[in-house]
Amino acid sequence: MNQLLSGLRAAAEPTRLRILALCARGELTVSDLTAILGQSQPRVSRHLKVLVEAGLLQRLREGTWAFYRLSDTGAAAGLARGLVGFIPEGNDVVARDRERLEAVKSLRADIASSFFRRNAGEWDDIRKLYINDEEVERTLLALLPQREVHSLLDIGTGTGRILEVFGKEIDRGVGIDLSREMLAVARVNLDKLGLLNCHVRYGDMNQLPLTYESFDAVTFHLVLHYAEDPAAAIREAVRFLDPGGRLVVVDFAPHEEEKLRTEHAHRWLGFEDGEVRSWFKAAGLTPGRTVRLPGNPLTVCLWPATRDGAKARAGVPAAALEART
C-alpha cells in the first residue's frame, strides 16, 4: 500500500506525467527530455529523481550519461504502465511532446546510421567466413523455443539483433554491451520495431549491471571470444539465470584465422567443445548437445546448457535466491 501511495504522489504533477508518457515510448536522457519538455536541466532532473525514487522509472547508467525508462520490474512497474494508459491520447501537450520525441529519435537514427556505415565493411568481412546469420538464428530459436522464453538476457548484444529475433514473443529482454556506439544502433533498431519490452544497457560481461533481476534464458552470441576469462563471464551470467533456465553460447570452433586476433581484437580463436562444457559444469550448468554449423573456413557452434535446480518460484529472482543460500 505504501509503495502504491508513493507512486501516485510522485506522478501527481503535470510534467511528471508527461515524462512517464515519453519514457513509455523508449529510453531517454536528461538532455532528450529537456529538449522535448522545454524546461531547464535542473528542473527535469528533479522530476526524474522523484519518479526513480518512487520506482516508476529506471535509471540506467552509461558512462557519464544516464537513460531513463519505465520500470519493468518491481511493485511499481504495473502502476507506471497503468498511469500512462490513463493519459488522454488526444491531449495537445502530449501530442506536441510526441512530435518532439520523434525529432529526437530521428537524430539518433542518423547518428547510428553513420556509425553503421563506417563499420559495415568490417562486419561483412567477418560474416563471409562463416555460415549465414539466418541459419544461426534458426538454430538458436530451436534451442530456445520462443514459447518457452519469457525473459531474455543477451550479453554482448551489439546491434541488438538477438533481442529483435526474440522480442515479439518474450515479456522482457535486456541486452548488455560495452560499446556505446553499438548500444545507440541497438536502441534505434528496437525502436523501429516497437519493441518497448526490450532495452539495452552499458556494461561489462564480467560485472553485469544488474541487481536482483533474473531471466529464464541467457545468450552469448559471437561475443565470448572477446572475453579475457570466458569461464568467469559464464559464471557471472549464471548468477542471473533462473534455476531450470537455459544458457546458450554461440561462437566459433577452434580455427587458424589469425587476422581475427590481429585485426578484429578476438582474444580467442574459437573454443574446444570440452572446455566450454567444463566451464558450464563449473558454473552449475548441465551441458546439452553441441550443434555445429560448418562454414568456410569457420564453424559456428551452439553450446546449450541448463541451470541446475527446479524452476524459480514466480516473482523470486535467481540472484535473490542465490543471496539467501
Model segments located where?
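N-terminal helix-turn-helix DNA-binding core of bacterial DNA-binding proteins
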Residues: 2-43, 64-73, 139-141
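Amphipathic alpha-helical dimerization/coiled-coil segments
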Residues: 75-124
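Conserved alpha-helix/loop element of class I SAM-dependent methyltransferases that forms part
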Residues: 131-150
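Class I SAM-dependent methyltransferase SAM/SAH-binding core
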Residues: 153, 157-207
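A short acidic, Gly/Pro-enriched loop at the edge of an enzyme's catalytic core
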Residues: 206-218
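A short SAM/SAH-binding and catalytic strip from SAM-dependent methyltransferases
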Residues: 216-229
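A short glycine-rich, Lys/Arg-flanked "PGG" loop and its adjoining helix->strand segment in the class I
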Residues: 231-246
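C-terminal alpha-helical "lid/dimerization" subdomain adjacent to the S-adenosyl-L-methionine
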Residues: 246-304
